[in-house]
């Protein structure tokens, strides 16, 4: 635990989402109604689930390589975000933390399981507190997801429009 990390509103806002996700990932019990911001929780959960599905083998290798993983988390967080902080990287750190927590739970290391949400939260805040503050904490994630969805839909509509125009042009050729 890092005593230099300020335990303020940002800390507890981030911890609330991380802690509940870790519990849900380890137990399989839905935690949507235990969080302060259900919409953010669902976004984080869905993104983490995708990352875990796609990267579970790499996460397992990372855990096998480290002899003292719980003490190496701050360094792993630093290595992940030292050159650039993005929501994808922040969510990847949370997903990795959830996986590590589940491994510890399976090994019966409950003392570390209870500390993992705090370790991840502190590691994130010690490296990117100002960025998270500038993002207005989880509101920045919601805006990021909303803007990406808008871009996805606009791109999709352009493709559909292009397909329709092409189809009409082809039909016109045969008439």
From Swiss-Prot:
Pfam families for this protein: Bcl-2 (PF00452)
Topological type in the membrane: Single-pass membrane protein
Keywords, sorted A to Z: Host membrane, Host-virus interaction, Inhibition of host apoptosis by viral BCL2-like protein, Membrane, Modulation of host cell apoptosis by virus, Transmembrane, Transmembrane helix
Location of the protein in the cell: Host membrane
GO biological process: regulation of apoptotic process; symbiont-mediated suppression of host apoptosis
Source organism, top-level taxon: Viruses
Transmembrane segments: 152-174
Gene3D superfamilies in alphabetical order: Blc2-like
Keyword Membrane attached: yes
UniProt main location, coarse: host cell
One of the record's GO cellular component terms: host cell membrane
InterPro entries hit by this protein: Bcl-2-like_sf, Bcl-2_BH1-3, Bcl2-like
Description of how the protein assembles with itself and partners: Interacts with host BAK1 and BAX as well as other BH3-containing proteins including BIM, BID or PUMA.
Protein function: Plays a role in the inhibition of host apoptosis. Interacts with host proapoptotic factors BAK1 and BAX to supposedly prevent their activation.
Protein name per UniProt: Apoptosis regulator Bcl-2 homolog
């Amino acid at each position: 635990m890092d005593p230099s990390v300020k335990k303020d509103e940002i800390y507890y806002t981030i911890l609330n989402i991380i802690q509940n996700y870790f519990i849900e990932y380890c137990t399989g019990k839905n935690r949507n109604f235990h969080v302060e911001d259900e919409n953010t929780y669902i976004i984080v959960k869905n993104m983490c689930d995708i990352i875990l599905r796609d990267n579970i083998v790499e996460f397992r290798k990372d855990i096998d390589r480290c002899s003292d993983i719980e003490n190496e988390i701050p360094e792993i967080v630093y290595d992940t975000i030292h050159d650039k902080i993005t929501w994808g990287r922040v969510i990847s750190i949370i997903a990795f933390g959830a996986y590590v927590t589940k491994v510890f739970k399976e090994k019966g290391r409950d003392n570390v399981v209870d500390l993992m949400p705090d370790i991840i939260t502190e590691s994130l805040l010690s490296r990117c507190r100002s960025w998270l503050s500038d993002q207005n904490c989880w509101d920045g994630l919601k805006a990021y997801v909303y803007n990406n969805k808008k871009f996805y839909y606009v791109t999709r509509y352009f493709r559909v429009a292009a397909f329709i125009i092409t189809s009409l042009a082809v039909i016109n050729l045969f008439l």
